[in-house]
From Swiss-Prot:
Keywords: Cytoplasm, Queuosine biosynthesis, S-adenosyl-L-methionine, Transferase. It comes from Pseudomonas fluorescens (strain SBW25). Monomer. Belongs to the QueA family. One of its GO terms (molecular function) is S-adenosylmethionine:tRNA ribosyltransferase-isomerase activity. This is S-adenosylmethionine:tRNA ribosyltransferase-isomerase. The gene is queA. One of its GO terms (biological process) is queuosine biosynthetic process. One of its GO terms (cellular component) is cytoplasm. Its EC number is 2.4.99.17. It is found in: Cytoplasm.
Amino acid sequence: MRVADFTFELPDSLIARHPLAERRASRLLTLDGVSGALAHRQFTDLLEHLRPGDLMVFNNTRVIPARLFGQKASGGKLEILVERVLDSHRVLAHVRSSKSPKPGSSILIDGGGEAEMVARHDALFELKFAEEVLPLLERVGHMPLPPYIDRPDEDSDRERYQTVYSQRLGAVAAPTAGLHFDQPLLDAIAAKGVETAYVTLHVGAGTFQPVRVDNIEDHHMHSEWLEVSQDVVDAVEACKARGGRVIAVGTTSVRSLESAARDGVLKPFSGDTDIFIYPGRPFHVVDCLVTNFHLPESTLLMLVSAFAGYPETMAAYQAAIDNGYRFFSYGDAMFITRNPAPRGPEEQL
């Protein structure tokens, strides 16, 4: 399969650069994985697609204000995007500057703070901060908005680029399907008899990196840390036993569950995953998916195509464009039931 198979033309006006006034105000495009039928709804209509006994699995990672600005001791300006917190003082980060800092050099952080460049690990820099890094980021860091939201972060992004159920600090990008849920909607879901469970996957900046090969089978995924607990495994098993459906909220929840079930059986798992889900890969756990609209030629679009079928996914995206849906992190959403026999790019509608 070629990366070019997953391209589409998106008008710039459909890129959502700000969230709507209310989380639940988004639109919802539903895709029946069996029939391929589409329906245009509001996000609150999601309740109509849920059944008592279903299990919704959310990613409870919390975004850290991971973008810092500063300067080298020589005076040159730089920008830091923390990719992963290693311990209380050390991080791996992307550093953008005219010249890369050298090991042993000092970095002065705007707003107060200092770091030392310890070592370089391929594209990432290991930095050691003089003070504890998480309090420093909370104090002077900026929310790491995706590159397609081409504006400076605002105070409101500290709330809106965060799910209402986020708990575990560590992500540098939000699990955006969860941004549509407010507490009253979560309460209504529970009142309908739908169970909930929480995995953790700390989304990395690599989620925005383009696929740089022609054939997707040659692509190597970036690594991200996740945890699927025994409680989640028990909840999934109970759901399946009662005939319920496992509904993943977001591609990160899919990647978490399917990473923990690579041999076909879901087991507790804690550690890094580089799972790459593209058309042809089977799903062992997830039955339905809530997800946003993703970038052309992205691994996330490939995952959705594996779940819903390639022709059905691309047709749904064209319908979304034709009907003015808002795309990407602050955009609208889809609800997809899994296609039992998904087709690839070679099997067009």
